From Swiss-Prot:
Keywords assigned by UniProt, alphabetized: Disulfide bond, Ion channel impairing toxin, Neurotoxin, Secreted, Toxin
Domain statement: The cysteine framework is C-C-C-C-C-C-C-C-C-C-C-C.
Protein known as: Turripeptide OL139
GO molecular function ontology, one term from the record: ion channel regulator activity
Organs and tissues of expression: Expressed by the venom duct.
Lineage: Eukaryota, Metazoa, Spiralia, Lophotrochozoa, Mollusca
Region annotation Disordered: where it falls in the sequence: 58-82
Protein's organism: Iotyrris olangoensis (Sea snail)
Predominant place of localization: secreted
Length: 82
């Protein structure tokens, strides 16, 4: 681990249990669209493999993610393959 870059999947979905590498700004589970929580026991896991954002916090709401990135991660995923 270097600085705030965590090389492990650090967020776990509350609902479907999937663990994904994500950040507080876009931590929406693609599987079920629920907000995920960090699963790294307080390590600095703010780095996002998907969007590169590091906002220095571990949690977010879907509303925050939508405002920050202009839509949920799932929405952007399906737009990207359309």
């Amino acid at each position: 681990q270097e600085g705030n870059v965590c090389h492990r999947p650090c967020f776990r979905c509350h609902v479907c249990g999937e663990t994904i590498a994500a950040c507080a700004a876009c931590s929406i589970c693609i599987g079920c669209e629920e907000v995920v929580e960090d699963a790294c026991a307080g390590n600095p896991c703010y780095w996002c493999d998907n969007c590169g954002v590091n906002d220095g916090s571990h949690r977010t709401t879907r509303d925050t993610a939508d405002k920050t990135h202009g839509g949920s991660q799932r929405d952007r995923f399906f737009q990207s393959i359309a």
